[in-house]
Design a protein with these regions (language model features):
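Catalytic center-proximal scaffold of phosphoryl-transfer enzymes
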Residues: 1-155
């Protein structure tokens, strides 16, 4: 097999789909899922081609974010990364205690998390932490896709 061809994986609670492709681009996704994921929330690693895929909405994968943030903490001793991780853990804990009925009403804890995130995204990061600055810029662009699962599937 060509070493440049890699496996691409899509997974749900019921099935795993594996495709082989040279890239992770939109064409690869469209070749395998012409209609996108119109009845699903697409959870992914923030790759641009995934955002171009049709779905109910998108959710940035928390595990991917935490892995990056752990690296920033270890490599840069970044207090910004630590604060971002704390917000993610608060969101995870909030999701655990919410019932389906809770999503029909305003959730003050979620609003507080979004406010904390907004302040954190405005916080200046030292320029020598280039990767952390890039991460902050990416999250600022896609912040609306961070807490989707604490909103319920309909957003």
């Amino acid at each position: 097999m060509d070493p440049d061809i890699r496996d691409r994986l899509w997974q749900s609670k019921l099935a795993t789909f594996i495709a082989f492709s040279l890239n992770r681009g939109t064409a690869t996704i469209n070749d395998n899922f012409a209609n996108g994921f119109e009845s699903a929330v697409l959870v992914h690693d923030c790759w641009k081609s995934h955002f171009e895929t049709s779905s109910i909405t998108h959710q940035i994968c928390t595990a991917h974010l935490l892995r990056e943030l752990n690296y920033f903490e270890e490599h840069y001793q970044s207090s910004w990364a630590r604060a971002f991780k704390n917000i993610l853990y608060e969101a995870i804990n909030l999701k655990k205690i919410l019932s389906p009925a809770d999503y029909y009403y305003p959730i003050n804890q979620r609003t507080e998390l979004e406010e904390k995130l907004g302040l954190l995204l405005q916080t200046s990061i030292p320029q020598y932490m280039k990767e952390v600055c890039s991460f902050q810029k990416r999250i600022t662009r896609y912040k609306d896709y961070l807490f989707i699962l604490s909103r319920g599937a309909s957003g």
